[in-house]
Amino acid sequence: MYYNKQAIKATVGHGSVTVKDFSAGINGNKDEENLSLGECAFSYNFNMQGGTLKDGNGVKKSNFGNSPVFSEAGVKPERLYFYKRYNKDAKAYDEYLLIYASDKEIYAAKSTEEQFKKVDGLYFYTPPYACSYNYMGDDVMIFSSDEKMKVYDGTTVTTVENVPSVTSMCIHSERLFATEGGTKTSLWFSDDFNPLNWKVSLDEAGFIDIREGVGSLLKAVSFKDYVYVFANYGIVRVSAYGDQTEFSVDGIAASSGKICADSIAVCGDRVIYLAEDGFYSFSGSSPQRIMRKIDGKIAGVDNSDAKGCYFNGNYYCKLKMQSDCGVRDVLIKYDIHRGTFAVSSELDINDFVVADGEKACELLFLINGKAQPAMLSDRAENFSVPLDKHWLSGKTDLGTTETKRVTRLSLRTLTEIYVTVKSERGSRLLHFFGSNERQSRAVGLKGDLFTVSIDCRTPGATVSALKIEYEY
């Protein structure tokens, strides 16, 4: 008996996945294997808000006055301050930038000047806190640290004697309120209408001892008719109007994680801050968690030196985050109305301040190694030098648990980019050029789980419609 022999062909399945929308952004709370393809394990210097990968924020030369230069040889700028005072003779405001530098001196530049110059007498061993106050009809800048308090009026410096060791301060109801660095449990307040008088008496200055089980006091802020005192592990509300005999501590909100002092910023109708376990928004009652998707990226990272501020509807915070290549210094931009955030990196920020001038309001930065303050740019750049932009997917099985072979990857990009496809069996680097047309590249990589990373250095990034084709 004879049989016809026929070749037995293996059945090959085909499939594809597409990322049409990148706006899901970073999700550090899920294991990478559980991320959807539209989410990413990490990203920086890309703006994903509209669903397309575009340039995020960078910094550029500021337009503050004559863009003054700090040129003191061998001295590094460390802190940045803004000060404005009404010039009665000119009937206009004089505006200044001030820098605390590594030589412990403070340097000032008026907006009409081109160089920072040392201010004689403004010397502090540690970076001071500062706030503006209209004292006896004159706009002055009060500087204070854990060693001394000094007042600068744009020309002269006055040292204030017999003041507490200040670790933060704010103006409330015409008094200066300050947390104290000695016992770290005292909230001091100056005489009303006189922030230079700290003599303790029933009708002058005084202090409130706060021992509520919240740890050391970190920062005092004036918010919604109260002074809120942020401590290591909680927030204390102080009613402080009228006669000091009527001052009272009348509310406490606990924090499960240690609060980072300089991250605290009043943002309109809320205060936003960073604690060890993540970011919080506080509107006067119970703190609420925000930006939960990055909790996993900051867990276990020391952010005791994080700093935050509020500018133009956004909360900005300089901090450290875990990335796919270790711990990174980043700048978070959080839109308080939309609840969205973006991450910038490779800026090397020393400090920043909101310069609330009469003609313009800008967020200004001290960038390490740069002689001039910077301002925000809508391009991913550092003083005209393009920044690397990076997006990394989670680990995906592309919708099937079987071993598969990625055959092609296609997308749209208006600029040059590099795409890396990885599996447990290897990797492929794909090069795409800027074009108005959809582009496709062969991959030829087997595996069970895959990651895709997109890297771009060219300004004006626009990446969309990522499609991965495979067979199994």
Give, region by region, the residue ranges found by the protein language model.
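Residue-level signature of beta-propeller blades and closely related beta-rich strand-turn architectures
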Residues: Y86, D146-E147, G182, Y233, ...
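Short, basic/low-complexity N-terminal boundary segments at the transition from targeting/disordered tails
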Residues: E147-K148, D250, K333
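Short strand-coil-strand connectors
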Residues: D103, S145-D146, G154, G181, ...
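Hydrophobic or amphipathic alpha-helical targeting/insertion segments
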Residues: S132-V160
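Conserved structural-core and active-site-/substrate-pathway-adjacent residues in large, well-folded domains
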Residues: L80, V140-M141, L176, I235, ...
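Short glycine/proline-enriched coil/turn segments at helix->beta-strand junctions
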Residues: G154, D225, L414-E416
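Beta-propeller and closely related beta-pinwheel folds
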Residues: P68-K76, L122-Y125, V157-A306
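Beta-sheet repeat architectures centered on beta-propellers
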Residues: M1-K117, F124-P128, S132-Y135, S255-I259, ...
